[in-house]
Amino acid sequence: MEDLQLDHLRFVYKSAVERWIAAIREEEDLATPDHSMVAVEAWDQAAFKEEAARGDAKAARKEYADALRKVLYNF
């Protein structure tokens, strides 16, 4: 695997982490003093989005780490 491919995997990973961070901040912003059903439902939806973004970041990390292990340790 060439450095260009590793750079791409690193970029994909870092982008996924940035989306995860944005989703965390969005969820945090929705934890407001507004205790209405609408506000709680929006907060719950943001939590689902955060969970999905976390999964994407973890998958991208695994792909990048696996590629690094293959290059560095031949497995």
Features from the language model and the residues they span:
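Basic/polar low-complexity intrinsically disordered segments
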Residues: 2-7, 52, 66-75
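Long amphipathic alpha-helical coiled-coil segments
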Residues: 32-41, 57-75
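Short E/K-rich amphipathic alpha-helical oligomerization segments
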Residues: 17-48
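Short, charge/polar-rich alpha-helical segments
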Residues: 1-18, 47-49
